[in-house]
A protein has these predicted regions:
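Catalytic cores of nucleotide-sugar-dependent glycosyltransferases that transfer UDP/GDP/TDP-activated
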Residues: 1-565
Length: 565
């Protein structure tokens, strides 16, 4: 990597090589949107000519021989070993190793345990199990990885941490480079703001390895000297706020989330080093159509919808955890689940789909209440909830309780087993995707739906207010409806309107148009949705924004290098 010389130190000239630190990476280990988002970052940067290394805890993936072969994993000749000193004064030994591989041109480094104690944490297959310890040991791993890349002339142009789990590791890596007088910029992305706090001991040289020493912090228009511990104590040990303060640039996934959530919590004065980098999707309508034709012999949305609703007896989706399975099983007869975990069919009608985690944030409890009211006006409406179980059994029980009185209209699929092609087919066939989130930094499910031409009905919160264009605000460019947050009535009205427009413009049935609050061609709305995704939410557009953010961070690092001089 070309380095620019400053008095007594070096800093990158531009961005040629990026380190992406993350706990999730699609194709390695991923639970939700973070893994897909970081993979889009990495592969998009690669398309722009940036060499990318993704660094993640192993989560035990190196034990899977098939996976190891598929990414050509091989052990690296580097070990991080030492002792952490606990608050109890005892020493806790760690021994960390590394596996190196490649996935679609992106270099992977998996951080693993080399003894049973270390492996019990870094290699735990549950991504977020023992989370504070995984995050701490990932930071300790930098003590060996940084000298290794220095010796092999592989110094990154930027270190990019994604969410708080990798923040201390990224800051520690930057500190280790600066010990060698190389000012590598640190970029921090907040995908979802978390209020995680620890005492200084957690981050310190005793535990996670961060040495307390002077550091330059950007204060509105100049860098000022502080120390890592002083910054930590200033923010009360809040890891997200600490990472933002330490960063050369930080990003969030939407302007609304940055303005309404992030800056009010970290400080408006930090806006000068902020960036907005949208997530992206690789969903395409062509892929949905090909699968629909191959699997169901239908590419027309209405025809596919009919076949999918009739095909439900062939869909077997067994929940992965006992609590979810038990909740559904006990009510199976009233919610259309058969004894073999297949589903009773549904009759044809306007279809609304929900996808995402079954958690309070995502608002499925609000949706099921709104849908009950929809049926008063559109009796043949259908709702399919395709949810990822979260362990919130009270919320799931509430869904089941309400769905039990709508046996002929609602199906709940609570399993991770539904393949991407089938998920895409359900969304493609839908009248609309409904996203009733109480808060949403970005809303990738909405973008995925629009990518296959499915309009979105959402609460007008945070990122959803940017991804979805309300038809009432712009009939020419609208992609769906944004309604008042947590309003069951407005959500119902939007769903009834979508059903009316879909029937009128896709089936020639205008019998419901008296209930619609706008009159627009639903086919045109579908086209608008696809155009919007192609212009704003594709991998290349995301990578260009991210690269601009990296270059802002490079300038900041150069300013710090000048301050050092």
């Amino acid at each position: 990597m070309p380095l620019q010389r400053f008095p007594g130190c070096l800093a990158p000239e531009d961005v040629e090589r990026a380190w992406l630190l993350t706990f999730e990476y699609a194709g390695v280990a991923s639970l939700g949107g973070l893994g897909n988002a970081v993979r889009r970052f990495a592969e998009g940067l690669l398309e722009l000519g940036v060499k990318v290394t993704v660094i993640t805890p192993s989560h035990g993936r190196h034990f899977d021989e098939g996976f190891a072969r598929s990414v050509n994993l091989r052990a690296m000749s580097v070990v991080a070993e030492g002792d952490r000193i606990g608050l109890d004064g005892n020493r806790y030994h760690y021994r960390i190793g590394f596996e190196r591989g490649e996935l679609n041109g992106v270099e992977l480094i998996l951080v693993k345990g080399l003894d049973s104690a270390t492996g019990s944490m870094l290699d735990d297959p549950s991504v977020y199990s023992k989370l504070p310890e995984k995050a701490s040991l990932l930071a300790r791993a930098m003590e060996a990885l940084v000298p290794y890349v220095l010796a092999n002339n592989e110094v990154p142009s930027v270190i990019h941490s994604n969410d708080w789990h990798t923040a201390i590791a990224g800051i520690r890596a930057r500190q280790l480079f600066e010990d060698r007088k190389i000012y590598v910029p640190f970029v921090y992305t907040i995908h979802l703001f978390n209020d995680v706090t620890f005492p200084w001991h957690y981050a310190s040289i005793d535990w996670s390895g961060l040495r307390d020493c002077p550091t330059y912090v950007w204060k509105v228009y100049r860098h000022e000297v502080s120390s890592h511990r002083e910054l930590w104590e200033t923010v009360g040990g809040h890891v997200e706020r600490f990472a933002v303060m330490e960063s050369d640039a930080f990003s969030s996934v939407s302007r609304a989330y940055l303005r309404n959530v992030v800056l009010p919590r970290v400080g408006e004065w930090l806006d000068g080093k902020s960036c907005v980098v949208y997530n992206s999707t690789d969903w395409r309508v062509e892929d949905a159509v090909r699968f629909a034709e191959r699997a169901f012999g239908a590419s027309d949305r209405s025809a596919l919808r009919r076949r999918l609703l009739e095909w439900l007896p062939h869909l077997r989706a067994v929940p992965e955890d006992y609590g979810t399975g038990n909740t559904l099983w006990n009510a199976r007869k009233s919610i259309g689940i058969r004894d073999d975990w297949t589903y009773e069919p549904l009759g044809y009608g306007p279809l609304f789909v929900f996808t995402g985690r079954l958690v309070f944030q995502k608002g499925p409890d609000l949706l099921i209440r709104a849908f009950r009211e929809v049926l008063q006006e559109v009796p043949d409406a259908r709702l399919i909830v395709i949810g990822i179980p979260s362990g919130d059994y009270a919320l799931l029980g509430d869904l089941v309780s309400h769905a039990s009185s709508m046996t002929n209209n609602v199906r709940i699929i609570a399993s991770r087993s539904l393949g991407q092609d089938l998920l895409k087919a359900f969304v493609y066939s839908a009248t609309a995707l409904v996203m009733p989130s109480r808060w949403e930094p970005f809303g990738l499910s909405a973008v995925e739906a629009m990518a296959v031409g499915t309009p979105v009905i959402a609460y007008g919160v945070d990122g959803l207010s940017e991804t979805v264009i309300d038809l009432r605000a712009s009939a020419e460019e609208g992609t769906g409806f944004l309604v008042a947050p947590e309003s069951v009535r407005e959500l119902k009205d939007a769903m009834v309107t979508a059903a009316a427009l879909s029937k009128a413009y896709e089936e020639g049935d205008r019998s419901l148009m008296g209930k619609a609050f706008v009159d627009v061609d639903w086919r045109r709305v579908r086209e608008n949705a696809m155009r919007r995704v192609d212009s704003e939410f594709r991998q290349r557009a995301t990578a260009v924004r991210l690269l601009d953010c990296y270059r802002k961070a490079v300038k900041m690092a150069q300013y710090r290098a000048l301050s050092f001089g």
